[in-house]
Structure formats: structure tokens, C-alpha cells
A protein has these predicted regions:
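Binuclear metal-dependent hydrolase catalytic cores
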Residues: 1-57, 63, 67, 72-73, ...
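Cap/insert and terminal regions of metallo-dependent hydrolase folds
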Residues: 65-153
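Structural beta-sheet core signal
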Residues: 57-58, 121
Length: 158
């Protein structure tokens, strides 16, 4: 992406925008919210939402250093639903290391390591076609049926 679409500045938005620092853990009504710093060059936050015995971990813009990062696996262990960045193939990653995004195989390994009950791989490379994504998802599901690719408008029962 390039100007004027990227980067987007707060001043270019036609809305009142305010920013707040949030603590590592807090509540929004009955929902417990925990945060973890992501590994991304522009900074990013990973969120864990827990309510009524179910938990969701949202980890986009995340470039893990290994297939089982201890800090992330401890944070996400046993979550009901893991939404995890999986933008690149290993071949693409060679050219995009340190961009702040994971590979599909690494994200699959992490989902297994942290014991997520369901996983949706998200933050797909925008250059991929729907057909390419479907083929990649089919390959992943052969060995990991609880791991799927996230889709726009998708609903998941927890």
C-alpha cells in the first residue's frame, strides 16, 4: 500500500479519536481483558478476552521468534479460540523477516503448542486469491482439523 491510503494518520480520519494507555489486565463489564506486547516493528498488542469460562486470544501483527514461544504459549494456553497472524509462506518470509508477521506453518505449530481448542489463522497476505487461501487451508486441515482460515463475516460458536 502507498499514500494516500497508507499510512493512515489520526488527523486524516473524520472522527474524534482519542488514545488511552491500558493496564496489562482490566475488566470491561464481566469480560476480563489481558494484554501482551506483540512482536511488531510498529508496536502492537495481543489481547485475551475471558468471560463465562471461554477465552479468545487475538494476535494479529505478531512475528513469533519460534514455533513455541514460551511467553505467548503461557498467555494463550488452552484458549477457546485463537485468532493468529499467518500472513506468509516460509519462502515469502525469507524476504519479509522483521515485518511483524508470522508464517502459516509457524502459526500452526504455535496453535498446537499452546493447546488452543479452535484456531483461525488471520491476517492473510492481501496478494492471495480466495482459491489460494482455500488450497492452503485444505493442506493445514489435513493434519490439524481444529485449525481453519478466518474469513470476513465469519461467526464462531464458542
Amino acid at each position: 500500500m502507498s499514500p494516500p491510503l497508507w499510512p493512515v494518520t489520526a488527523g486524516s480520519l473524520k472522527a474524534a479519536v482519542s488514545f488511552h494507555d491500558v493496564p496489562d489486565a482490566f475488566f470491561v463489564g464481566p469480560v476480563a481483558v489481558e494484554t501482551m506486547e506483540s512482536r511488531h516493528p510498529g508496536g502492537s498488542t495481543i489481547y485475551k478476552l475471558t468471560c463465562g469460562g471461554v477465552s479468545l486470544v487475538y494476535a494479529t501483527d505478531y512475528e513469533p521468534e519460534s514455533d513455541a514461544p514460551e511467553d505467548f504459549c503461557a498467555f494463550a494456553r488452552g484458549c477457546s479460540l485463537l485468532l493468529l497472524d499467518a500472513q506468509y509462506s516460509p519462502e515469502e518470509y525469507v524476504k519479509t523477516r522483521d515485518f511483524g508477521h508470522s508464517t502459516i506453518p509457524r502459526s500452526v505449530a504455535i496453535a498446537r503448542s499452546c493447546g488452543a481448542k479452535q484456531t483461525l489463522l488471520i491476517h492473510h497476505d492481501p496478494k492471495r486469491t480466495d482459491g489460494q487461501l482455500l488450497a492452503l487451508e485444505t493442506a493445514v486441515r489435513e493434519s490439524s482439523p481444529h485449525i481453519r482460515f478466518g474469513r470476513e463475516g465469519q461467526e464462531v460458536l464458542l
